C-alpha cells in the first residue's frame, strides 16, 4: 500500500495526464484535489485521444474509483458534458466509481462573466486567465461567499445564499465592468437542473478516502497546473488561484499528510509556459518554434500556443524543495531529437550577479537571463526505446545531467505520447 502525489514541477502542461494514467494501474482511487476546468489532461490510449478537464485520468481504467475533492471548483455544465462524452465512449459504466466532495465549490455564471470582463479591462496587464470563472470562484470561497455542492443540493440553502450574493455580483458587473446583470430566476432554473445530475455523485469524500486507507487501499493524487503557478509559491500574480503544490493534495482532499508516501514531480525535457509572467529560458526564435511544433505545444483547454524554452534546473530544484519530491518524471524527451545541441539553464544572470536559486521577487525574475550549459544532442528516433540502455548515449547523458542538477532521482522517462512509449525506472507504488 502506498499513497502517491503527482504534481507539475514547472508551469503546467508537463504531461501529468500520461504519468497518472500509467500509475493508475497500481492505485485503487485517483483523487483530483485542486483547480477546475482551466486544466486539461491529454491522454493517448491506443489510437484514441482523450482530453479531460475535470474528471481524473483514472476514469479510463475500469474498476478505479475517481474522486473530485473539496479543493476543486466545479463547473456543473462542464462536468456533465464530460461524463456524457465518457459514457458515450464506453467509460464510466458504474456511477459509483466517480465521487464529488459535498464540500467542493461551484462555479456560478457570474464568476465566468466577471472573469472574462476583468481580463478584457486589464489590457496589457493581463494575467492570461482561461476565462472559465476559476479565480472568481476561489475568491468567493476565501471570502466565505461561495456556493458549495451541498448548498446546490439543498434548494432552500441555494436560494438563500445565491440571493444574498447576487446583488453584490450584479453591482460589480454593471457598475464596475459594464456588463449585463443576472436574474435569480435564470440562475435557479439552470442550476436546479444540474443538481438533479450531480446528486448521485455527491459524498463525504474525505471520510471515504480515510476508510480506503484504513482498508489498505492505495491512493493516487492527481495535481493540475504546476508548481510555478501555485498561488503561494508561484510567480505571483501570474499564477492560478489554488494550491498546486504537494501540500494542496492534503488540504484539497481531506487526507492527512501522514498518509502521503511519495511525491513525484513531472517535468518536460524542456520548458513551456502559457499566459503572461516571467520565463527566463524562453526561446523566441526558430528553435522555440521547432520545439512548439515538435511537441505540439498548444493548450488542450484554450488551444493557445505555449511559450517554449530550455530546461531550467533552478525551477526544478525549487520544485524539489517546495514539494519534497521523491522522484522526477521526465516527459517529451523525444521532442529534443534532431537538436544539434541541447541546453540546460544552470544559473541566472541578474544585473551581473549570478543567482543559483529562483528569486522570490517577480521584478528580479523578470530581469534574469539564463546561464546555460550546452550538451550534445541526438538525431535518433527514440520513441521505441524500452530502457535507458536503448537510448542514444547523448540522450542518456542529458537525463543524467538533468537528474544531477535537479537534486532528485529520475523515476520515469517518457519517449512518446502513447502509454507504452515510457521507460519506468522506479515504481513509487512499490515501497522499499
UniProtKB/Swiss-Prot annotation:
Substrate binds at residues 300-306. Disulfide bonds: none annotated. Pathway: Purine metabolism; AMP biosynthesis via de novo pathway; AMP from IMP: step 1/2. Its EC number is 6.3.4.4. The keyword Metal-binding applies. Mg(2+) binds at residues 13, 40. The keyword Transferase does not apply. InterPro entries: Adenylosuccin_syn_GTP-bd (IPR018220), Adenylosuccin_syn_Lys_AS (IPR033128), Adenylosuccinate_synth_dom1 (IPR042109), Adenylosuccinate_synth_dom2 (IPR042110), Adenylosuccinate_synth_dom3 (IPR042111), Adenylosuccinate_synthetase (IPR001114), P-loop_NTPase (IPR027417). It is found in: Cytoplasm. Its main location: cytoplasm. It catalyses: IMP + L-aspartate + GTP = N(6)-(1,2-dicarboxyethyl)-AMP + GDP + phosphate + 2 H(+). The active site is at 13 (proton acceptor), 41 (proton donor). GO terms for biological process: 'de novo' AMP biosynthetic process; IMP metabolic process. GO terms for cellular component: cytoplasm. Plays an important role in the de novo pathway of purine nucleotide biosynthesis. Catalyzes the first committed step in the biosynthesis of AMP from IMP. Homodimer. PANTHER family: ADENYLOSUCCINATE SYNTHETASE. This is Adenylosuccinate synthetase. It comes from Geobacter sp. (strain M21).
Amino acid at each position: 500500500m502506498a499513497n502517491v502525489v503527482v504534481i507539475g514541477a514547472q508551469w503546467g502542461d508537463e504531461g501529468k495526464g500520461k504519468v497518472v494514467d500509467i500509475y493508475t494501474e497500481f492505485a485503487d482511487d485517483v483523487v483530483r484535489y485542486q483547480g477546475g476546468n482551466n486544466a486539461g489532461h491529454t491522454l493517448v490510449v491506443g489510437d484514441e485521444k482523450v482530453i479531460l478537464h475535470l474528471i481524473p485520468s483514472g476514469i479510463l481504467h475500469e474498476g478505479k474509483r475517481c474522486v473530485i475533492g473539496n479543493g476543486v471548483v466545479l463547473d456543473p455544465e462542464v462536468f456533465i458534458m464530460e461524463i456524457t462524452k465518457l459514457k458515450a465512449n464506453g467509460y464510466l459504466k458504474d456511477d459509483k466509481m466517480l465521487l464529488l466532495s459535498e464540500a467542493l465549490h461551484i462555479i456560478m455564471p457570474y464568476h465566468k462573466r466577471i472573469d472574462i470582463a476583468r481580463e478584457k479591462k486589464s489590457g496589457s496587464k493581463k494575467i492570461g486567465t482561461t476565462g472559465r470563472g476559476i479565480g472568481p470562484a476561489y475568491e468567493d470561497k476565501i471570502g466565505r461567499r461561495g456556493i458549495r455542492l451541498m448548498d446546490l443540493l439543498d434548494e432552500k440553502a441555494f436560494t438563500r445564499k445565491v440571493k444574498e450574493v447576487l446583488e453584490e455580483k450584479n453591482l460589480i458587473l454593471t457598475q464596475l465592468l459594464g456588463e449585463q446583470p443576472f436574474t435569480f430566476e435564470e440562475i435557479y432554473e439552470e442550476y436546479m437542473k444540474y443538481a438533479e445530475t450531480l446528486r448521485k455523485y455527491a459524498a463525504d469524500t474525505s471520510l471515504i478516502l480515510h476508510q480506503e486507507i484504513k482498508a489498505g487501499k492505495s491512493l493516487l493524487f492527481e495535481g493540475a497546473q504546476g508548481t510555478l503557478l501555485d498561488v503561494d509559491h508561484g510567480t505571483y500574480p501570474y499564477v492560478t488561484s489554488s494550491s498546486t503544490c504537494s501540500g494542496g493534495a492534503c488540504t484539497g482532499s481531506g487526507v492527512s499528510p501522514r498518509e502521503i508516501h511519495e511525491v513525484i514531480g513531472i517535468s518536460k525535457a524542456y520548458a513551456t509556459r502559457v499566459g503572461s509572467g516571467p520565463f527566463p529560458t524562453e526561446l523566441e526564435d526558430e528553435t522555440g518554434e521547432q520545439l512548439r511544433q515538435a511537441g505540439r505545444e498548444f493548450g488542450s483547454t484554450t488551444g493557445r500556443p505555449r511559450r517554449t524554452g530550455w530546461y531550467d534546473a533552478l525551477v526544478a530544484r525549487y520544485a524539489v524543495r517546495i514539494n519534497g519530491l521523491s522522484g522526477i518524471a521526465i516527459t517529451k524527451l523525444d521532442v529534443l531529437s534532431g537538436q544539434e545541441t541541447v541546453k540546460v539553464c544552470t544559473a541566472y544572470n541578474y544585473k551581473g550577479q549570478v543567482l543559483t536559486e529562483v528569486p522570490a521577487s517577480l521584478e528580479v525574475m523578470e530581469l534574469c537571463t539564463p546561464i546555460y550549459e550546452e550538451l550534445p544532442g541526438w538525431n535518433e528516433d527514440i520513441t521505441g526505446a524500452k530502457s535507458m540502455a536503448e537510448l542514444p548515449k547523448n540522450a542518456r547523458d542529458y537525463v543524467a545531467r538533468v537528474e544531477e542538477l535537479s537534486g532528485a532521482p529520475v523515476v520515469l522517462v517518457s519517449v512518446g505520447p502513447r502509454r507504452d512509449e515510457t521507460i519506468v525506472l522506479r515504481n513509487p507504488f512499490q515501497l522499499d
